[in-house]
Regions:
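Basic, polyanion-interacting recognition surfaces, primarily
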Residues: 2, 6-122
Length: 122
């Protein structure tokens, strides 16, 4: 049984956040989504707090449980718990509405929409 345990991937459970002159931990379970803008990565919590993270979205994808987080596009990585609804968009794409609301449209590309629907229905 210990061999099986060792082979199971361990996913990140928290982040150390620097805010002003304070440090605190943020549980991954409190995260609604991550987004990238101007070469910075931001984390938005379920209670609508926003912090800068020192991780690229690609790195986060490797460290977070793929059953919980989905890379919707180059700019966003969303938690299944934050998704409020999905609407069809042009050319086979979809728009994802999250809580707390994101300032832009979160668009899932035509290439990812099938995988996204499978992921949501898991």
């Amino acid at each position: 049984a210990s061999d099986v345990y060792k082979r199971q991937k361990k996913y990140r459970t928290r982040f150390l956040i620097s805010s002003g002159n304070k440090l605190f931990t943020l549980a991954v379970s409190d995260v609604a989504y991550f987004y990238s803008e101007n070469k910075l990565t931001f984390v938005v919590t379920k209670n609508n707090r926003e912090y800068v993270l020192d991780f690229a979205l690609d790195k986060l994808c490797e460290q977070l449980n793929p059953d919980v987080f989905f890379r919707t596009n180059r700019q966003t990585l969303v938690s299944v718990d934050a998704i409020q609804r999905i609407e069809p968009y042009f050319l086979g794409k979809a728009v994802v509405h999250v809580l707390p609301p994101f300032k832009d449209k979160i668009i899932v590309s035509k290439d990812k929409i099938a995988a996204f629907k499978v992921w949501l229905n898991y």
